[in-house]
């Protein structure tokens, strides 16, 4: 990610990287044109209720923020409403967290790109609640995966998509280029790399919202010049890796 950040900065994108995202950070995504959620995720079943137990299954995003008594008091209403849950002492968020945090539509024009596993559920149980909550909060476009995704495939798709966004392309065209390059799903990519034991269900990236969304890239040089700059930087990477 540090390399990606430097590369994108070189293409004119002001980039902020946060490796210790907190619940408070997730309430401030409206500050950015593009938010990339790179964390563990799961289509998770949990129990709730003191006297009468209930279960619920839905996509969650796992944070590295540890639960404390003080924080539990601050987030008390969110915990009671299951907008936040706890797993192994760490906070996780459900779709209702975003629906509540951005209930006034503050995410206006933001593109949300999630790398988390099972952001949209799993095969035969596709769950669009995360995407729906973010779109309801004003997000212009939301992208996320169905099923568990191979990390290298996910990083490659992100890399290619954002590079082409930085060149001035729409999110729809940028995503199409990434899929043409790395495959419609991660098993296609895996087998093309010579893999022989793919996981059970292919992960694939789905776009919701406006396919014509773009980043507000600097206008100090043209699309052609931006593409040439990207190609030069990629050539430098390949040369250094050779």
Regions found by a protein language model. Give the residues of each.
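A domain-level signal for caspase-like cysteine endopeptidase catalytic cores
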Residues: 1-82
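Solvent-exposed, well-ordered amphipathic alpha-helical segments
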Residues: 5-9, 108, 242
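Polar low-complexity intrinsically disordered regions enriched in Ser/Thr and small residues
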Residues: 44, 52, 79, 92, ...
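Catalytic cores of nucleophile-dependent amide-cleaving enzymes
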Residues: 60-156
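Active-site-proximal C-terminal subdomain of hydrolase catalytic domains
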Residues: 111-229, 234
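Long, low-complexity, intrinsically disordered segments
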Residues: 233-242
């Amino acid at each position: 990610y540090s390399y990606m950040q430097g590369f994108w900065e070189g293409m004119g994108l002001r980039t902020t990287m946060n490796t210790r995202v907190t619940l408070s950070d997730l309430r401030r995504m409206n500050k950015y044109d593009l938010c990339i959620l790179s964390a563990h995720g799961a289509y998770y079943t949990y129990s709730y209720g003191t006297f009468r137990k209930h279960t619920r299954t839905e996509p969650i995003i796992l944070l590295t923020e540890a639960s404390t008594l003080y924080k539990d008091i601050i987030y008390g209403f969110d915990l009671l409403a299951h907008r936040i849950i706890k797993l192994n002492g760490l906070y996780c968020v459900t779709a209702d967290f975003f629906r509540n945090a951005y209930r006034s539509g503050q995410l206006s024009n933001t593109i949300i790109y999630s790398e988390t596993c099972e952001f949209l559920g799993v095969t035969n149980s596709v769950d669009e609640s995360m995407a729906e909550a973010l779109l309801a909060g004003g997000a212009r476009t939301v992208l996320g995966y169905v099923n568990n995704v191979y990390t290298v495939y996910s990083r490659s798709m992100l890399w290619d998509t954002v590079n082409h966004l930085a060149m001035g392309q729409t999110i729809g065209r940028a995503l199409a280029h990434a899929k043409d390059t790395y495959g419609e799903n991660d098993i296609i990519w895996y087998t093309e790399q010579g893999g022989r034991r793919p996981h059970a269900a292919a992960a694939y990236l789905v776009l919701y919202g406006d396919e014509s969304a773009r980043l507000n890239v600097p206008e100090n040089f043209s699309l052609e010049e931006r593409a040439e700059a990207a190609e030069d930087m990629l050539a430098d990477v390949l040369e250094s890796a050779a």
